[in-house]
Structure formats: structure tokens, C-alpha cells
Amino acid sequence: MGKIHELSSVLADQIAAGEVVERPASVVKELVENAVDAHATQVDILVQESGVQSIRVIDDGDGIDDAEVLTAFKRHATSKITSREDLFRVHSLGFRGEALPSIASVADVVMNTSTGATGTSIHYRGGKLLQQSPAPLRQGTDITVTDLFFNTPARLKYLKSPQTELANILDVVNRIALSYPAVAFRLVHNAKELLKTAGRGDLQQVIAGIYGVQNARKMVAIQGSTTDFKLSGFVALPELTRASRQYITVLINGRAIKNQQLTKAVIKGYGSKLMVGRYPIAVIALTMDPLLVDVNVHPTKQEVRLSKEPELAKLVSTTITDRLVDVNLIPSALTNLGSHRREHLNTDQLAMDLNAVSSQYQVADKTTPASTEQFAASLAAATMQPSSATTMVSTTSAQPSAVNRAAVSAVVPSESAASSANQPIMISHRDELTATPVQAFDQRYQSESGALPFGETAEPLETSTAASAPTSEAPDTERFPQLRYLGQMHGTYLLAEADDGMYILDQHAAQERINYEYYRQAIGEVSADQQNLLVPIILDYPTSDVLKIKEKLPLLAELGIHLESFGGNSFIVHAHPTWFKAGQEEDTIREMIDWLLQDDKLTVAQFREKSAIMMSCKRAIKANHHLDDQQARALLAKLPTCENPFNCPHGRPVTVHFTNSDMERMFKRIQDSHEARD
């Protein structure tokens, strides 16, 4: 007998199953996708012991003709494609013809299927046909998989914990449900219903069923298109985040896919609105010509290759960015304070309007998609548990201690000063702190102009050409309210009011945002302004780092950092940009060089962004710094002029909002509707 021989069909199927059927979730995925491809409108998934004991999928789809049932269990047998051209225009979820034979080769499979005219029951175990018989059934398919991996114990041994395997099944079903909102899905584990969608074609209803009504209310619809691509979906407001990227779902032509570039594009669309290490909930549905996407990359069909991927990524990021510009991003304090109880939803509860993305998230001059308008009919009818807030707020007008009074003084650029740039607010140390009348604040600002960054000085008001001209940075009162200062709490938070309630602001985050927008613009400008050093800075690095640094010298020079070789592995710096914080010049330069050493693909834009964030944080006031009334009011007056006054550059919220009704509820001046009925 020769050394080379053909493998048996059963062994070949078991080998193929190693790629197609990795875990119980893989079985669920393949069977549910088959049901969707068969035009099912209702799919029930019944799982026992995380799928290891049994998996049953019932659908009302087309069914399989009795003459083709055996063919369906042969390798590479499919109804999805017939020619080579079809492979480049795949519209179905499955097309490789590997799922059923792969599953049948490593498990016990019983399938009952009917086209409505005739029905068939078939039984496979370990790839061998045990029984086939007629079975009168309604139209659809009912397939049960038991004893998974009974003949491949190594695969069974390396399964994760039951909780992890169940979580994988949930993730698979969730993503398919998000891909096909017109199909009603029901997932039951050990007789407990874990997921139920209504199948009414409304994506936001499905999001509510998966992530909860409270979270769905904090998501906004997005739409965008180019010549080649069409985009729709929902993205969470920046306050609704998770610790991992797995809550970002990208769908291409109805298929949930994994693509690192598109996931990054979603995150990029939020910019600095997200906290560091936090990621949004997002469902991005993309439609394109099948010729632009190759799904025949891996048997699981989750990894795809995209034509024009940079253009698609740009569409995703810009659509999200533009949408969030129109949304009031001030979070409700009560919504984020209490602990929310998980809601168990029935189908009736899912038929609610979530487009009221809550009155606290008002959208300016945007039309609502038709699907969301249908949703907008009954959010008030949803059964909600009121957030309980036991937080007590104590406001006092106590003056700062003598030590703290001597510690701070604000220098705030005048809106009518000669430079119309968005200057950062500087808090500097002084021996004495004397109160300044509001009317004399501009004069005080001029007298302290030496503390201005970038070596600038303010022109006298009477000679300023900008003094009589209307400011170009009028506060956007529709997006951010004009606040009236009330007081300071613990030297960290500012209390303010507006017509719609009370606001609490993090003074560090607020000033950091103001500074960031100034530095982002200033660092991006080519400026010859340099501050000479009395004592040059000497920087020593190992040889491997020196080679990398020399490659990046042009990039450093664009930001005004000029390194000169100083023999061996050393560099010397004679001057630095004027926007460096005094006393931290060497630390700042070293930190910037470290960025380049850690990421050799860092672009100029990314480098400037990181520099702006670093400088804005270094020059912002910290917690436990008491401000006088003029300083606090100046901070509140400057904040609305920011492009994004809602978050600091690291994504932390600048302010939270207690509405008038929130305050009345906390003090029991009004009752929630469900309390009134009790």
C-alpha cells in the first residue's frame, strides 16, 4: 500500500469540523444562519448545559425537500451558490456547504424538516447515517444536536467554563438578532428565557431587548452614505461605555464581521468624548456591493477583506462625529447615580418608543428616521424602576482657608482681547489673593499678562481691534447652557444653576477641556516662538533608541522640539516651545520622545493630539484648589465657547445635570406615575 492515500469522508469531515465547529457557540451560529438563509421569520434556540448536552434550533423557514436531505449532509453541498461568479456576489450567510456534515461528524444530530408538502426525519451520529424516515410536519426545520464532541474528547476537554460557553452562545445570537431585526429570535437555556426579540423590523427594539431599555434610550440613530457604501445604525452617547470593544457590532450586508479598522473607526468617531480604556455600545450596519467584500477568507466567515477600506473607515468615523455634534451630551445625574435593576422584558414591553432618547438628550434640527418614529409611540408606557438617589448635597458658602486663599489666582483671557484664540485658563500661585470686581476683571487680566502661555501679551482694551467687534466665539446656548455660579464644594466641584435645573462641574475637567482646545490649535500651528534655556537639557538614550529618535527628528521639529547630537548617545536641547509649562521642560520632552519610541507608527496628527492632551492636563487646576467667585465665573463663561464642552480630553464628564423634576422627586415634592397609582 502506498504512503499517500485519500482520507475517508468521515475523517475528512472531522478534520473540517476543527475549523467550523470549535465550540457549542459555533454550532448555534451555523444552525441559526441556516435558518435565516431559509427565510425564517421565527427562530427558537433551546440550549441545555451551555450547549454541551444539547442544542435545538427550530425555525419556520423553507425546509428541505425529502429528496435533498441526504445531499445536505454531504461536504460542500449547498443551495446558496452554483457558479464561480456567485462566489463574488454572496448574499447569504452560508455558502460553503460545510456546516451540517461537520456538525454531524462530531455529534449526534436529529433533523426533522418539511417544505410544507412532505416531511423527513433523519438521524446522524459521528458522521454515520442511522435512520431516515417520513415525518409529517409543519413547514420549517427542527434540528437537535446532542453529545457534542463525543468522539473528539480533546476538543471537549478544552472547552471553557459553562458560563463562558453560554456567554459565547449569547454573543452569537445577539449579533445575528441585530443583523436581522425582522426575524423574531428566542434563546432559552435550561428552560430559562435569556433573549426574546419581537421581529418587527425595528433595530432599536432589538437593541432594547439585548442591552436593556435604559441603555437603548441612551443610543442615537446614525445615517451616512457615499457612492459605494451606505451606513445606518445606533451608537451610544459617550456616557454609556463598556470596558471592552466587544459591544461594538459591525454588520456588512447582514453579516456580523470582525474588522479591526472599522472598530477603530467607531472609536475614532467619538474623539476625546470617551474615557480612556472605555468603549461604546454601537451597532453599525453597512450595505455595499458584494464585489467590494470578500467573505471567503475563513470557514467561520467572520473575517472579511474589504475593498476601499480606508474610505469606509472614514465614513464610519465622520458619521459618528457629525451625529454627536448635534446631541446634548450633558448626562443626567440621577440616571448615572442609582443602581439600575435588570429589567425582564416581554414582547409588549419591546414595542415602545425609544426615540425619546430621553428629554435630557435633545437633538437639534434633525429629522428622525422612520423606524425610530414608529418606536417613538410608547416609551412612557415602559415599565421602569425609578432610580433611587440617597445622595445628599450640602452647599455652603464657606471661604477658603488662609493657606488655600494664598494658593490660587486665575488669569483668564478676555473675549475682547486682541488675540481671538481660545486661550487656556491659567491658575498660578501667588502670595496674596485679592478679590477683583467683575467690572475690573479685564484690567486685572492685562496686569497679569505675563502668565499667558506662548509668550503672548494682551493688548490694552482701548487699542484692541477686537474690542469693538462682535466675538466669533459666542456661546452655543442650545448645546451648553449659560450657567449662574452658586458655589464650590470641597475645592473640587463647582455648583451652578440654569433655568432647567442644577449643574455640578468638575473644575479640573472643565479647565482641562478649555486648555486642550487651545493647545490643539496652537500645537498645530507652525510657530517660531522659542524660549531659550539658560542651562541646556542633555538627554541620554541607549543606542537602539538613538537610532529611532534620529528617524523621528523631523516629526519632533514640527512641534518645535529641536534635538542636536551631543556626541555618543546624547542629544542637547537649547530651546523649547513657549507653550511648555515652566519647570517641566525636560519631563515634557522626555515624555514626547517616549511616545515615539513606544509607537513608531505615530503620525503627526496623533503626536499633536497627545501633546495637546498632555499640556492641557499639566496646566489645569487640580482637586482641592479653592477658587474665588471671579475665577469660578470666568471658568463657567469660557466653557460654552468650547467646541466640546461636555468632556475632558480623557473622556471624563465635565458636568452632570439635576433637572428641576429630579430635585422635586428627591425631596418628594412630586411622585413618579407608578407611585401615584399604588
Curated annotation (Swiss-Prot):
Listed GO CC annotations: mismatch repair complex
Listed GO MF terms: ATP binding; ATP hydrolysis activity; ATP-dependent DNA damage sensor activity; mismatched DNA binding
Record-level GO BP terms: mismatch repair
Name of one Pfam family that matches: MutL_C
InterPro entries: DNA_mismatch_repair_CS (IPR014762), DNA_mismatch_repair_MutL (IPR020667), DNA_mismatch_S5_2-like (IPR013507), HATPase_C_sf (IPR036890), MutL/Mlh/PMS (IPR002099), MutL/Mlh/Pms-like (IPR038973), MutL_C (IPR014790), MutL_C_dimsub (IPR042120)
Protein keywords: DNA damage, DNA repair
UniProt function note: This protein is involved in the repair of mismatches in DNA. It is required for dam-dependent methyl-directed DNA mismatch repair. May act as a 'molecular matchmaker', a protein that promotes the formation of a stable complex between two or more DNA-binding proteins in an ATP-dependent manner without itself being part of a final effector complex.
Similarity field: Belongs to the DNA mismatch repair MutL/HexB family.
Protein name: DNA mismatch repair protein MutL
Species the sequence originates in: Lactiplantibacillus plantarum (strain ATCC BAA-793 / NCIMB 8826 / WCFS1) (Lactobacillus plantarum)
